[in-house]
Every structure is written in structure tokens, then in C-alpha cells.
Amino acid sequence: MPLEKSLLEADIGALVKSTLSVESDSVNIYQEIAFESLVKDTIRLANGLQLSKVNEQYVCGDILLSDKQVELLAKKNVSRGISISELSQIWQDKVVYFVFASNVSLKDQNIIYDAMYEWESACNILFRVGQGSGDYIEIIIGNGSYSNLGRIGGKQTLSLFIAGWNKGTVMHELGHALGMLHEHQHPMRDNYIIVNERNIQIPARDQFDIWPYGYASSKFDFDSIMMYGSYAYSRNNQPTMTKKDGTTWTANRSYITFNDQLVVMNLYGHYLPPGPIG
């Protein structure tokens, strides 16, 4: 299909050249996608879920998936479903260990600490510098903003895109590291929104598939820190998603909602008061 190929090449170029999704002139919402400048192979599982693969790494938008997670997803069908606790392991004792790569400046570290404190203040999670018992996150400035889903065991990566990120980006990616999925891929989303596939950049279409499993909340939350905005990954400045009445919304990257709190508490248990990070 020559037309489809040319559109794909154009969309890859758009993703590489543009680090800002089209949201609002007053709010910086940066692209959240893994391996921004690399061409990915597309993989469609038998249950319809589309993933990408770069070298040996499975990717769904800005989520990195382990071989074990993909194997589990491939075995599950829509009717049976899958729980979030099956799909992503939680962090032991509610403590997330992390280290900074050498390319993360002190200024950047302070922004990241602020984002961590937002989660600590809202939920029952503690962030601590170090490698713990061997399961930890290395935070890097890299080729895209992305994270593994939950704790995968050993060292894992949380990347912030070298071309642009902010505190809200960190809050979003930390949500994935804790085990949260995208709100706009919630199995109930079609009751609340319309996805305009023709307006989505082709390389980003896997970010708009419904995940019929892995959600810890039955409520759909437009303000979730894990929700994309109406113009995310638009190829033509038209909305990729609208509410049922045709209106649009801007992604929240400023605060953690009550529903976000409930999701994390469903995963990790009761609330713990925040302590000093470090």
C-alpha cells in the first residue's frame, strides 16, 4: 500500500521532529513515547492488542513490557480478563528504590524528587535512593519518555525525553512504574469517549487500543494523571479523542486525582504518611 507507507514515513518524521503533543498553548504536555526516533516492528496479539518491538524490547507507547508480561497477555482473552496484580508486580514493602544515571543533573533531580513527593503525599508509597535488594529503577535522560510497567525484577529503566519533559511527565511515568495503565485505554472508555482513529499518527495508534484487563478501578477518570488529552498524537491538528458530546479536554499533568489514589491503594494497601525522599 504505497499511500499507507508514505503516511507512515511522514508520521514517523512528525514524531521525531515534534516533542510537544498539541494540547494547549498554556500547558506543556510532552510526548510520552518510548524510543522516539527509532522505527518499531508492529506485533498484533491474538486477542487484538497491538504492541511494538524495538530490538528485543516490547513496547506499548511509553510502556515497556517484559517477555513474561507479553506471554501473560497473549494467553489471556477478553472474556477471561486479567488482574493488574497478575500483570505487574508491586514493589515490596511499598518502597520503590531508584538511582540516577550520570546524565541527570542536580536541577533535574530536584524536579524528579518533587514528582515523587506528589505520589508519596497522595498514596502509600515511599521512594528511596539505592538498589534495595536488587530491584530498582535507573532514571535516565534518554530517547523518549517511558517506563516499565510495575516492578519487573532487577534493574529497570525510567527515561525522560532529552528533547523535553517536566514534572508532570515524571508523575505520569512513575504511575506506570507503580503498575498503572493509561486511563484512555480503560475497558469502559467507549462509554465516555470517541476515538478518532483517522486523526492519530500511525506509529502511535497502539496507544489508543483498549486494554480489556489489568485495571484496578472500574471508574473512568478524565482528570487522571494517566489520561491523555484530546489532541494527543494528532496528525492533522484535529482531536484524536472527544467526549461523547464532541467536546475536548486537556490532559492533567499537575496533580494526582482521588481515583488515581484509589488505584494505587488497591494495588499497595493502606495509606502511609510521606517521609523524606532519599
Question: Can you name each region flagged by the protein language model?
Answer:
Residues 1-278:
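Zinc-dependent metalloendopeptidases
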